[in-house]
Amino acid sequence: LSPSSRVATYPAPSGEAASDDYAVAVNGTPVDVYAAQGQYFDGDYAFAAFDFSGRAEIVVRSKAALDNVQIQPARYAGWLTRRSAHEIALRANAPFQISIERNGRVKPLLLFGNAVETDAPKPGDPNVVYFAPGVHRTGKIALTDNQTLYLAGGAVVKGCVAAKGTNITIRGHGILGGEESPRFKGPGRY
């Protein structure tokens, strides 16, 4: 790996569900892996995100054997090197979003390799609704003309966005989850 490689990771906030199915490291730096549920494909999945520049070696360890592992989109399959029945490695030199699917779509791992952020707004900047690292239960976030919603890496915002106007942006490397929004709550898993 080149000396100019850079990796930024963001610790998961306390209380957020961690995956016990996967472990991820980028250039030797551990990356927190979240556990999540969706409405499709049997629901359970895991995801991890990090920022990098230069080259990155991503090592994924799985509690279950990585039999018949596939990467989607398929154009990234050439990145994959199998190290053992439970470990694979990937090499990347540009941002990516992939799904690592073992034995079909059973508990896939979604990986988000983002470009290192260079122009992040600061708390208190005008027209910026800023969320720092941590868990934030917001309900509805209303955005209007010329506003930016910014989610810092390590922020988990549990709410929904109502945007009405022009020149509205949502940025950052945090997580915006609608699982606590009344629209998605219900008597069951979803």
Please provide the spans of the model-predicted regions:
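Extracellular/periplasmic carbohydrate-active domains that bind, remodel
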Residues: 1-190
